[in-house]
Amino acid sequence: MVTPGGNVLLIDPWLTNPVFEKGKEELAALKDVDFILVTHGHSDHVGNAVEIGKKTGAKLVATFDLSAAMVTALGYPSELADTETTGHFGGTLNLLGDEVLVTFVPAWHGAGVTKDDNSPPIYGGNPSGLIVALRNGPAFYHTGDTDLFSDMALVSRFHKIDIMLVCIGDHFTMGPARAAEAVNLVGPGIAIPMHYGTFPALTGTPDAFGEELKKRGAKTELRVMNVGETITV
């Protein structure tokens, strides 16, 4: 995400994932990143965050427990993970002179921080969703990995969500039907499906998600993004 002021935010940056053929190339070329936002500690969401943080000096934005675990267990630079950029559910961080507001909201999922040595997961607190609001710009709701839950309806009481990034893959998160119901609870202008197709187990598809939105009479626009695609809003 690039703000109107030119600042760069990454959310769950797994550039070297199996479906991004240019991932290693993009990772090597990455230079300017201001903040890395991480929703929970699973390896497919922490992704390349530590490497990028060390390389670019990007500050880590995460819940207090996850931030501490990423510093102690994964080696994220401690000077880039302080109280300025750590918080918890219901709290809002004011970044870049209030140009960016980040609010932590719940997600229903696991959160253990995993290492490459097959050791047991390390406590990483609770998983989160993120609301990212840009000054004089759109507000995004990134659900993180989650199931549907009724408190999603509270999001729209405090935030007008323009774009909802919603997991649809099934198996480890909600699938298309439950994701469509989540969209109805939040009522965003645009819904962008995510967290599907990376592994065989993630069987949910954008087409199925679109059909479920139609069944529910959703007024939200469905926007399906290709890997590596950029959109301007």
Show which residues each predicted segment covers.
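Zn-dependent metallo-beta-lactamase
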Residues: 1-10, 15-19, 101-108, 208-215, ...
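Pre-active-site segment of Zn-dependent metallo-hydrolases
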Residues: 3-42, 47-54, 74-78, 110-122, ...
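Beta-strand-turn-beta hairpins that frame and shape the catalytic cleft
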Residues: 3-9, 92-102, 133-140, 232-233
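Active-site neighborhood of phospho(di)ester-bond hydrolases with catalytic His/Asp-centered motifs
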Residues: 10-13, 33-41, 61-64, 140-144, ...
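Active-site environment of divalent metal-dependent phosphoester hydrolases
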Residues: 18, 43-47, 67-70, 91-94, ...
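Glycine/small-residue-rich loop that forms an oxyanion/phosphate-binding "nest" at active or ligand-binding sites
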Residues: 49-55, 61-91, 100-112
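Binuclear metal-ion centers of metallo-dependent hydrolases, dominated by the metallo-beta-lactamase
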Residues: 72-96, 180, 184-233
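Active-site-proximal loop/helix segments of hydrolase catalytic cores
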Residues: 113-185
